[in-house]
Amino acid sequence: MLSQWFRGRHLVVRSALFSRRRVSSESTSTKDDVIVDFEDPDLPLPEYPKRPDEPLETRKQRLMYQSRKRGMLENDLLLSTFAHKYLKDFNAEQTALYDDLINGVSNDWDIYYWATGVKQTPKEYDTEIMKLLKLHVDNAERVTRFRQPELTYYLKC
């Protein structure tokens, strides 16, 4: 028998084996939970406005800010370190692809799952920028990323 709880948009399913133990009301999540994410068709999400006349340097500065302020720590760390490392060297086309990636997706968890390989990346987002982000996430250099990089580095370049 399965017991189910709704938490926001996520459905957490726990087997009967784990539901027998006493769980406090504050902390009901365990590593054995299965999270099922589902789309809510009744929730209209506005499309991010395109900015075709925005100068490249202004766009890069906006993207640097948006990479740091995602609303979830996982993407804050991944995208801020990625932007810190690569954004200053992107050309206009690559910058537009990065803009589409971080602003075109309605759910930041999708970006996280695609970058970490948990979910398959849809064709429209499987670009050279996503491939570069996946390499960044693989972290072959074994760089520690416990905090976001300083903003002063980008401003000097």
Curated annotation (Swiss-Prot):
Cystine residue pairs: none
Cellular localization per UniProt: Mitochondrion matrix
Cited InterPro entries: SDH (IPR005631), SDH_sf (IPR036714), SDHAF2 (IPR028882)
Keyword rRNA processing annotated: no
Assembly and interaction partners: Interacts with the flavoprotein subunit within the SDH catalytic dimer.
Described purpose of this protein according to its UniProt entry: Plays an essential role in the assembly of succinate dehydrogenase (SDH), an enzyme complex (also referred to as respiratory complex II) that is a component of both the tricarboxylic acid (TCA) cycle and the mitochondrial electron transport chain, and which couples the oxidation of succinate to fumarate with the reduction of ubiquinone (coenzyme Q) to ubiquinol. Required for flavinylation (covalent attachment of FAD) of the flavoprotein subunit of the SDH catalytic dimer.
Alphabetized HAMAP family for the sequence: SDHAF2 (MF_03057)
Name recorded for this polypeptide: Succinate dehydrogenase assembly factor 2-B, mitochondrial
Organism: Drosophila mojavensis
